């Protein structure tokens, strides 16, 4: 017996995505299993009835065994054989129906144990069997809609939906810390929330204290800071106005929202490579570094931000919470589902796709 890592390409059961009711009915009730069950059950009781009849018709039967009592376990096992057959049919029909639900998702079978006996190889998918048994049984729906509170993602397979759910559960834990930090920063820096727009003038002023604006000439910044001797003019400058407003649904998402303006626009209409590189080195203004990161506001406004990397959550990393722990541990991680996963029907007319999306109602959001 050996354990190996197997990655197989996707397969299809042969049924189309739009499965008919007849196919679903046959797959669910498994008539061929019931036929064999009835046949073997009839054959089984046929031999029992023949043996009982042979003993009953004897007028004076002789006892060829001793008079000591015999155990009843053999009779009990003989009686529960039909029950075991019936249970086996129900389990197989349910399992096959779930396999149809996972029609193109065989890649979930990654880790298996192979036991070799008489040149046969028996596979047991130990790691993903719980996912297969707990998948919603909605055969005939070929798309998954994943609602994360402020967006909708479309998944072709349930395994990808589980991965998004795990990643979102992980980031939702970070949101709680982030919101607490933001509230703390709001109290200490007098940030005003007006119509879901954060006007963080204090925050902008604190960032200005980090900026080595004295090293830049008037051509770089667009004005002569030495003459005004007032750094607050930068607050009204177009360079900063676009970067310190947290609008609408993105109130908690600081995705390169602070310094990305420097990477996409020329400062004052002229971009000096030497000064711009110095600015990037001092304030970590490289857009590639800030892309898809979520920042802790306390680390962002502290001096430690210039000395080391801030606390962040990298959304580009496909964190799936599928580590080297048991599936039961993973199930405990998923107890509080932060997103709603529903399987919805996608019409053949893809032009009506957007209308179908808008008509779907959701009950759960990120918590």
UniProtKB/Swiss-Prot annotation:
It is found in: Mitochondrion. Keywords: Mitochondrion. GO terms for cellular component: mitochondrion. Its main location: mitochondrion. The keyword Mitochondrion applies. This is Uncharacterized mitochondrial protein ORF11.
């Amino acid at each position: 017996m050996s354990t190996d890592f197997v990655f197989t390409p996707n397969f299809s059961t042969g049924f189309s995505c739009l499965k008919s009711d007849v196919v679903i009915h046959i797959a669910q009730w498994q008539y061929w299993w019931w036929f064999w069950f009835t046949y073997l059950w009839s054959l089984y009781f046929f031999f029992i009835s023949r043996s009982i009849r042979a003993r009953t018709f004897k007028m004076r039967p002789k006892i060829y065994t001793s008079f000591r009592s015999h155990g009843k376990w053999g009779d009990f096992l003989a009686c529960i054989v039909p029950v075991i057959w019936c249970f086996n049919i129900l389990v197989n029909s349910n399992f096959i129906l779930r396999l149809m639900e996972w029609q193109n998702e065989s890649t979930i079978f990654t880790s298996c144990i192979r036991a070799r006996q008489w040149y046969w190889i028996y596979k047991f998918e130990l790691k993903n069997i719980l996912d297969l048994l707990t998948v919603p049984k909605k055969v005939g729906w070929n798309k998954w809609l994943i609602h994360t509170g402020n967006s909708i993602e479309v998944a072709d397979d349930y395994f990808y939906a589980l991965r998004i759910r795990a990643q979102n559960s992980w980031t939702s834990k970070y949101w709680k810390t982030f919101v607490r930090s933001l509230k703390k920063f709001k109290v200490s820096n007098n940030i005003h929330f007006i119509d879901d727009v954060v006007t963080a003038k204090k925050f902008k002023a604190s960032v200005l204290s980090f900026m080595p604006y004295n090293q830049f000439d008037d051509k770089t910044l667009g004005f002569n800071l030495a003459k005004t001797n007032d750094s607050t003019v930068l607050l009204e400058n177009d360079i900063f106005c676009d970067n310190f407003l947290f609008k609408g649904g993105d109130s908690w998402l600081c995705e390169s929202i602070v310094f990305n303006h420097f990477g996409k626009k020329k400062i004052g209409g002229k971009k000096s490579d030497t000064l711009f590189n110095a600015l990037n080195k001092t304030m970590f203004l490289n857009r590639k570094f800030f892309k898809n990161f979520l920042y802790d506001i306390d680390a962002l406004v502290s001096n430690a931000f210039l000395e080391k990397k801030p606390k962040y959550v990298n959304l580009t990393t496909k964190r799936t919470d599928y580590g080297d722990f048991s599936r039961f541990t993973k199930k405990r991680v998923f107890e509080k589902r932060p997103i709603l996963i529903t399987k919805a029907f996608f019409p053949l007319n893809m032009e009506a796709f957007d209308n179908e999306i808008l008509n779907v109602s959701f009950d759960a959001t990120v918590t």
